[in-house]
């Protein structure tokens, strides 16, 4: 039987602003990537999200981003590898405190947004991020875009890695995600998105926007929790994966 982890970016509310349906989404995912206060989140939100995830038995990961609250961490910044290292160590440390207080362990680290995409294509940034994760805790799993520099860097550093694919994003023929600045970056049809996931898990292939099949590995699937119909989609993909005889469980299980 095929199996896959289902992850979601959570804990992205901050201050007076509520983003996403975290408590509801946690019923359907097996891993949660919790924002650490730089691109989103705040101490109170981090504490509450860790507690909710722990109570539901969902594995927890740090979701470090660039220091860009206004841009939600989705805008590229010119940072050095040393700065990337510092950002990741700092944010892992921030979330670790709440995990320790709740009596649970961290499963993984998944960079957010622009940091994730920049690292996917830069060996220097990826090596710095992987080193930050390894030196913080060598038992952590590094989540990265399937086949990307980030996954390769994690392997070089001696980390366990998870190749990540996306349910609602389109792909280019080189295996990268279509830029969000393009109109066709997101898959709007739920059935199409679910079909893409099932094919990636079962066949290890995805159809690019250019019409070619791209080979990839799918260890974990990212769904988004901040869309208008995020909860509906979370329920649907969990149900359809089960119907396709795909077991959904945390990557570390």
From Swiss-Prot:
InterPro entries: Glyco_hydro/deAcase_b/a-brl (IPR011330), LamB/YcsF/PxpA-like (IPR005501). Keywords: ATP-binding, Hydrolase, Nucleotide-binding. One of its GO terms (biological process) is carbohydrate metabolic process. It is an enzyme of class 3 (hydrolase). GO terms for molecular function: 5-oxoprolinase (ATP-hydrolyzing) activity; ATP binding. It holds the Pfam family LamB_YcsF. Its EC number is 3.5.2.9. It catalyses: 5-oxo-L-proline + ATP + 2 H2O = L-glutamate + ADP + phosphate + H(+). Belongs to the LamB/PxpA family. Catalyzes the cleavage of 5-oxoproline to form L-glutamate coupled to the hydrolysis of ATP to ADP and inorganic phosphate. PANTHER family: 5-OXOPROLINASE SUBUNIT A, UNCHARACTERIZED PROTEIN YBGL-RELATED. Forms a complex composed of PxpA, PxpB and PxpC. This is 5-oxoprolinase subunit A.
